[in-house]
């Protein structure tokens, strides 16, 4: 895995086109993404060390979740690799209720970077300046859930 500065530069390059192609981003960061068809609904995703690739990581995401949810989960797992590779060990499993066994701070950091990846401030601000401020319209363009966009805009209820 590359250092955090290089990883953030790769992320920034992928943010030039909205919606961010999150699987392409993961691949460029050296991560493989697998969709798992038979996970329980409360299990969103996980990241673990790739036992075949020294220093590599694999991301697994629940195939039955909506595309917007899968995209956020992939971005969240990318964030763990970028921010917390030393904590991953044999894997971080994120479920709908517990998120993972990690601290709330670590999970909050991963959620913030995931939001930054999928809804970059610069792109969002340019649309807001053009008068595009509908949560639904922005969520559709950025391919995120209405809830994720509302949180990003600070208008979540």
Question: Each predicted region: which residue ranges?
Answer:
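Active-site hotspot residues in diverse enzymes, especially metal/ion-binding acidic/histidine motifs
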Residues: 1-157
């Amino acid at each position: 895995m590359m250092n955090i500065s290089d990883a953030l530069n790769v992320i920034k390059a992928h943010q030039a086109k909205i919606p961010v192609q999150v699987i392409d981003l993961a691949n460029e960061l050296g991560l493989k993404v697998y969709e798992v068809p038979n996970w329980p609904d409360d299990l969103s995703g996980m990241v673990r060390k790739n036992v075949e690739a020294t220093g590599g990581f694999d991301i697994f995401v629940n195939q039955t979740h909506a595309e917007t949810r899968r995209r956020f989960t992939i971005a969240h797992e990318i964030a763990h690799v970028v921010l917390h590779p030393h904590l991953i060990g044999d894997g971080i499993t994120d479920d709908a209720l517990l998120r993972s066994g990690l601290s709330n701070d670590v999970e909050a950091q991963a959620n913030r970077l995931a939001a930054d990846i999928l809804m970059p401030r610069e792109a969002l601000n340019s649309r807001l300046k053009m008068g595009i401020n509908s949560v639904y319209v922005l969520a559709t363009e950025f391919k995120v859930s209405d809830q994720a966009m509302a949180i990003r805009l600070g208008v979540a209820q």
